[in-house]
Amino acid sequence: MASREHLLLDPAALAVSWADPAAVEIPPELLAALGEYLSARRSDGEAEADAEAEADDEFMMYEFKVRRCARARSHDWTACPYAHPGEAARRRDPRRVAYTGEPCPDFRRRPGAACPRGSTCPFAHGTFELWLHPSRYRTRPCRAGVACRRRVCFFAHTAGELRAGSKEDSPLSLSPKSTLASLWESPPVSPVEGRRWVDGIDECDADAEMEELMFAMRELGLRKVRPSASSVTPVLPPVTDEDGPDFGWVSELVM
């Protein structure tokens, strides 16, 4: 039997006569090779299309984890920008449901419990609804700037990416200039579903923030490390870093 590489490079090795196409019986080796080729090409094309879509603000605010995924075969939800049944990262469409970019108080007071208002709740449910809301998405500069390596980042990496947000939806009525000043907010460092939310970083809450950070690391299966005040190079990032570690959205994607 010819090797797969030989089949791909030399169709003549199949010993098939193409004089009468109707009489040709395609060998299973060719069908298998063709299937693998088409599958790889389709996957590459879908990945490129997803990457292009995620670079668009409109897509991120109104389609990311909102539009139902149309793929029939099994795939990695964490690498797919579309919504799947039972996925914790799913969002309500802000164009169809009138909710604001403010966190739902029931999600904060009742960890793990469903909001009694359900899908009609006027507040954001979860990290993705909160930070991808048009009143918040990219209205804050990312601390890492162009060096950011997050696959999904809710913040602006250049001045050109900064958005003013919608005045009717935003409680802060931000302008692009004001976002570069002292107004800093960041996503919660803890997993949103099942844990309390942390909306800002405050030095007086350092102990509580460190506890949340340690929990987030345990949720991701990372090794628990106790910070040492005498350590020259801390293992964990300081809790006063407003942009926070990239744990919350990851845990939500894989739930």
UniProtKB/Swiss-Prot annotation:
The keyword Signal does not apply. GO terms for molecular function: DNA binding; zinc ion binding. InterPro entries: Unkempt-like, Znf_CCCH. The keyword Glycoprotein does not apply. It comes from the Eukaryota. Disulfide bonds: none annotated. A zinc finger (C3H1-type) spans 98-128, 137-159. Keywords: DNA-binding, Metal-binding, Repeat, Zinc, Zinc-finger. It holds the Pfam family zf-CCCH_AtC3H23. PROSITE patterns: ZF_C3H1 (PS50103). This is Zinc finger CCCH domain-containing protein 37. It comes from Oryza sativa subsp. japonica.
